[in-house]
Amino acid sequence: MITLLSTGSNAHGQLGNNTLDDSHIFQPCSFINHPPNSLPPGTSALLSVVSGANHTLVLLELVDQLGLKKTELWGCGDGRAGQLGKIYREESFAGSSTAKFRKIELFLEENGLPGYSYRLISASWETSYAVLSCSGKGDVVISMGSDEFGDLGIGGFARIEKSEKDFHVVKFDHLSTPSSIHNALRVESITSGQRHTIVHLQISESANIPPLLVGWGTSRHGQLGQLSSLSNSKPPPFISLPRIIALEDVVSSALGIHHSLFLHASGQMSALGSNRKGQLQLSPSKSVRAIGCTWNGSYAVVESNEGWRIYSSGSNSHGQLGLKANPLNADIPNSGIVHFPEILDSKSTSIEIACGSEHILVLSRDNIKEDRFVQQVSKFWGWGWNEHGNLGTGNTDDTLLPLKIWSNESGFISYLKGVDELTGIWAGAGTSWICCLHNDDT
């Protein structure tokens, strides 16, 4: 049985576990009008979990009785800014619980988007985003919630509109691309930090136009690049319409509060924004396979002859850099290699990283050959800030080095009970999430 578990900060019910109390252990999430400890019937995959300050969105894939797939958007937590849609906010004001996941109804067809479905999601502090796709048409990016720092990406118009909308459509037709090809736009990725968002746009190959990297939101620290032709001019506090970021061959992005990190197809990285905490001082120059950002830190997963290595730099106020020599001083820039108690073999092991506000989760899967059989040994690690119990270890003590929280190794005593396998990990603002295959009898 597929189950979503959560732990950590929960003042507004953002863990979706039917309480408003912080949780120090991973507990099953609840979906309204469905049996406890289970996802909605027909769920075949949990595609994504994103969270802001106090709200959470999950993207589910479901299969109906005819075998047809569809996606649904569910949310919980604080929706007062409209970050979970107009109906969710109205129902919450009327007394509906924010501590259970509710299906997010946005009436796409009534708003001029018939045939579209949810494909990607993202969230900043009090704003949510979804990428909609429809066969034969270009992708559409929608936003909902707070617009204090241009978060909605619509030019600040939300503050002067008198009528409330279910959502807003982020436009890209003001960019230097022919208007005739916007039906061929495909969104490869959408990533949000605390107050800024970056989208990777792929234009139809027949148009012979290279991919575009665009962003909006807070920009004071240069996290969205140089926005003026004058090199000595200061970036504006924020921009409220998507602007092109002059970087090429970007395959993924990761965003903190005041900085942005980019992974290029070459396996190299680049970065924009503040380096006040040393968050731009990552040392690997090649073979980077994945990146991540905490609020004031940067992380790079590197494939080396010695195995997987995770390089970290930036704030280390809660041990979130995972360094063996561990000066807990947020004001002294730090960088180094995360110290795991065992080698992660890059030849037989895959690795996944999730960065929260100031804590990190890692899931490794090792294919071990025994005689004629191959056994997959999975290990789930966590370290860093743990004030709200967001590492799920049953306490609120910060963890300075990677701690093995769960493994399917024989004889391992786990913090997670009754879990057969982990299929996904996510981290937020003092929150952590895991999707797992769960024993039915627990």
Where are these regions (language model features)?
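Short, well-ordered alpha-helix to beta-strand connector turns
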Residues: 250, 286-288
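Flexible extramembrane linkers and terminal tails adjacent to transmembrane helices
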Residues: 288, 346-348
